[in-house]
């Protein structure tokens, strides 16, 4: 299954690495990543990930990561989230 993640993470040192590490540890593979630094120092990320687990489960886990300010998940190309 393929999912799109829209994330906003704070600018703390290691925040991006923590998010990417959580995605991989939970059995998902990032197939595309777009990141843009915001004026307030936070990051706006748009990612496409592949995995067999439900996307909402990953969203809940990412929401617990330190400095993850917002997360939304949606299915890609008719896949169920």
Region locations from a protein language model:
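A conserved regulatory-domain signal marking ACT and ACT-like small-molecule sensing domains
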Residues: 1-81
């Amino acid at each position: 299954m393929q999912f799109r993640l829209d994330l906003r993470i704070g600018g703390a040192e290691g925040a991006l690495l923590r998010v990417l590490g959580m995605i991989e540890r939970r059995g998902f593979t990032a197939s595309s990543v777009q990141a843009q630094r915001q004026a307030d120092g936070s990051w706006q990320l748009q990612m496409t990930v592949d995995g067999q687990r439900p996307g909402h489960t990953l969203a809940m886990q990412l929401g617990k990561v330190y400095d993850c300010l917002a997360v939304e998940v949606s299915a890609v190309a008719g896949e169920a989230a």
